[in-house]
């Protein structure tokens, strides 16, 4: 894919990442933490535009959204920047390395999500003195519906795009 097309797609994915939380009801605690509306477009970006651009999208989207509407709050946005950048980077790299094998979409998705959660936990330990229990409860327990949604939705969308030959 030409760089111009990749950059255009990256800008579109960034816009989707920033705007998609508006689609959900405005209860950010319930829907923001549980369904993780900014996470899914970043994961999709890893497959569509590649690891480096997906990492940039993940790193800047929470800050753009914070500056635009004040949500997520800065205390949440900073760890999210690291988490989403890791999502994009690791998912894209693992997919590229293993794309010649079967199940590479699911494998790269799991690797990216796990790496992103680990980075998110480390940043929250440093910034907010989170304990292991807090990381497990907030990072995996509260986010479980979003994780399930991403595990279903991301492969479905990517397989669909591959089928209509929009991505490799």
Segment roles from a protein language model:
Residues 1-168:
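Loop-helix junctions at membrane interfaces
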